[in-house]
Amino acid sequence: MSSPTTAPHPAPPRLRVLVAARPALESRAVLRHVSSHLTEIELTGEPDAGPAPDAAVVCDDDVLAARLSASGVPVVFVASGGPPPGGIWPPSAVRCLHRPGWLAGQRAKGVHAVGTIAPPRAARARAARGAVVQLSTPDLDPADHAAVARAGAALRAAAEAARYDGKPLLGVVLDAPVPARSALLSAAGEDTDALPVVGVEEAATERLLAEASLLVSSPLLTAVNQAHAARVPLLLLPALDADQAGRLAGITEATGVGVLDAAAPDTSADRAVRAADPLWSRVSRALEHSGDDRRGAQRVARQVRQLLLAPF
């Protein structure tokens, strides 16, 4: 007598997590690093008309975080460049703060300070081929001619510094809205056909840094993390707004990273290259002293998994 066959159990539905970020260099970099540690989960982009996701990771987009929370989706909100403006956090199940161990700051109740959210260490090319520029102006309005002129001047000085050694620019990474990019490049006086421009949506910075001799960047915590991971010299651009001014002050006070002098870009770049080894030694010692193991991305990913197990 044959034994009855048992129907196979259907596979459990795969968990879906929405991942989204403000369209800014720092926000997208943090989201990219966190997402790389959630490979076993189905990650989706912007909300759609389909079933609600099981959870969400949102970097710096407080409007989206509040909307998802109101609709019943548990949210891990990540502040990528420091506490939100005014210290006002959006409604979310979990609040995570990206604050590297070398940066001083106060503890906030109900906030997980996760340490450094860093990119994976990448193999370096045998020889550097040139410099990389990243300029953060995510809110640039092409109709604001004064703001466009300031950003254009910053980009022009950054490009001059990047070419200090005669090597070509490997890439210029921008997060300016697409309608503002042509105005920005025009204000910088750059040949738009010759300049190797990539948008924030192309996630190019870490790939380019593998072959870079210098990173010239807006003052971003992620720029320090990226350059430190790649052991690439770093030169910061002057601040273009109040948020960048606060970040620039914190970074330079804590690490001593050099700031570009628009009147002497070549000298600024040369100084940054010569200061790179002592700079990264100081940063490494500060991370070790603070107990920061550069695993902040993994800590955020762990919060996501815990939310999936117990969302409320």
Please state what every model-predicted region is:
Residues 2, 79-148, 173-175:
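A nucleotide-sugar donor-handling region in carbohydrate enzymes
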Residues 37, 147-166:
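Short hydrophobic signal-anchor/transmembrane segments that target glycosyltransferases
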Residues 177-228:
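Donor nucleotide-activated moiety binding/catalytic core segment of transferases
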